[in-house]
Amino acid sequence: MLWAMQQATNSVVEALYNDPYYLGTPTIATDSMQWYHPFKIITWFMYYHQANYLFTSAIMWIGFGLFLIFIIALLLKPKALLTSHGSARWADYKDLLKMNLISSSGVTIGLYDSSFKRGLTKQLRRLEVKKNEKVAYAEMEFDEKQDKVLDRIPEKINTWLEEYNANTDPKRRKELAIKIKQAQAYLKNPPKFDIKKYRWTPTYFYDYFYKLAVKLYKKLPHFYLRDNSNKHLAVVAPTRSGKGVGLIIPTLLGSWKSSVIVNDIKSENWGVTAGYRKKMGHVAIKFEPTSDDGSSARWNPLDEIPIGTPMEVSMAQNLASIIADYEGKGKPDHWTANATNVIMTVLLHLKYAHYTDPENYPTPPTLYSVAAFLKSSIVIEQDKDGVYRQSAKGFVEAAKNLVMYEHVPPEGIDIVEWNTKACSYETRHFTQADLRAIYPNSTSLNSMPGTHPIIYQAFVEITSKPDNELGSIVSTANTALKEYLDPLLASNTSVSDFCIDDLMNYKKPVSLYLVTPPSDLLRLAPIFRLFFEMMVRHHARSIGTYVNGQAKSNYKHKCLFLMDEFSSLGNLQSFAATLSYIAGYGMKVFLINQGLPQINGIYGKDNQILMNCHLKIFYAPNDNDTAQYAETELGKTTIETKSKSRNAGRLIGYTNTSTSQMARSLMTGDELKRMEDQEVIIASGSPPVLTDKIKYYENNYYLEKLINAPIVSDVIRTDPVRNANAKREALLSKQAAQSSSDTFTYDNNIKK
């Protein structure tokens, strides 16, 4: 329009022959040129009635400008969205901003590059496919030739052996011996395929250019989507689909800056990311219950029970209920509920007895000592019908002897406990008066002031049960505790090098890796379920304080639960039920599963796990249930279709074209299965995102952060007596010796 007004102004100037008398002072004037600004025509229009013929061309130019604006507006007008059968669409950049996925930190969930970089990525993938094709054919050709050579060599060896005799010329005998030796060596260790031997062939050039392209591609900066909200995430991705290299490792390599708990099967994530997280200033802890080399930290669940405080019973009940429900059903039956009571009673008794009678209870109680206490109390007896049954007579006798056990003597006991703020062990004197203050309404304390009232009542209840029933109850408790009789597991749960409170309240953020060998996955699932359950119950007790009507959190650091292979932990029914509220307590859950059948098989089809996750990420599924679920979540869009019909008359036929609208899934289940290097992100209340997968090994941004993992786990509790670990010290000494031998020292006494 500005151009049209300039032309209109110029037309009036030309009509008046550049006469300043009529036109006024020009905006720019030189010896050879006079220029009036475009909006001058507006001032001159006040003389239209005196000389309208001067403005004929100007009006035409202005009209032409308005016409151009109208045409451009029509061309640039966005096409109206078709919504009659569905309004689903893919998210754009504005949607990502509203979804708060443009963040400098958080959980890394996808790659969102420009169109140009996406094109480069596609070309790199095509080159990779072509390279793999060429190398595969070359390797097949090599194997075919190799097989023929290997088939001929034994025949040649036999021929040479027949020729190798006393009548053969010595020079020839020497040649034959060398050939036979070389042939036998070839058979013993045949050469392997080597791409370098294919120089100046298309195969070698494809391989060379692919490696060169990857090297250049790694230097490109990329844009990553990150979720730093307080809402949960769920990933549904089949095995070997790239969730580790695309989600877990990028998140741990600096993206998530607060505390994190990683369910780390095979210790891969520890090996790749622990070094960098330690460099970030985190305390990098590895808890591997089956470790025997001293590299793992240790954790005793019984240390989480603060005896001599009002919290002791609730914490003991929580711990006992989780242990007794070793299958994670979340709905205890009669035997499980009573086994919970037995376990709670025994562990509370052992906790107090360690301080009351250190001669008979010399070591702090552990799950091993609880299991051993119960195991030694079961005997097998033959009833009157000749059937052998489990009897708890030994346990009944022990319980009867302990009913009136004095847990707090008149002089009191000195309880040793860890002070998380001072980071040291402290001794607290506990007396019978303190016990009375905790249980002011207990009548048993009137006659037995040193006997713990809860333990007393529990032992009385236990001893009053019939032998057969009690035998089954104790047997249920033993079944729940049987894994802790393993010497390795007992050793790694004998003392605590860290505690649950440290994860969110230590002075530094903590990165905890729960390492499980695949061979022990099912066996160790109960202790990891125990850890997660206790973590939630401990930190979800109080949401914080309120200042000026706003909540102020109690924790120092948020904590991410990065639960890779979530289903491998077994049934976490009670944990799954907490997903609806624990986000408000600073805990963010990142669940990773292989497919919906895996979740439904454990929690049932009516589970609410995915419903409680704000963000859901889908890789190409390999089962129909997941594909159908994702298709439904994406929704329907409206498309326009055209149909043609031809009416063939006698002389002249004609074609009739009709347009109609119909519903279509934004992406069908079949299309989801063929996504290859793409992923779908579905967020509540926002359009879904179709984006690319991350491969951290293709970007120097992540490769430069790869640092060797620590040789041993960090520990928070470092008391030289209570937390002594000879194997750990041996590993550290060995590392120190290697470091000193590798260090350059200048000796001034060395002469030339």
Which residues make up each language-model segment?
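Membrane-interfacial helical/loop segments at transmembrane boundaries in membrane proteins
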Residues: V12-A51
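Transmembrane alpha-helical segments in integral membrane proteins
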Residues: Q50-L81
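Residue-level signal for threonine
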Residues: D92, T366, T668
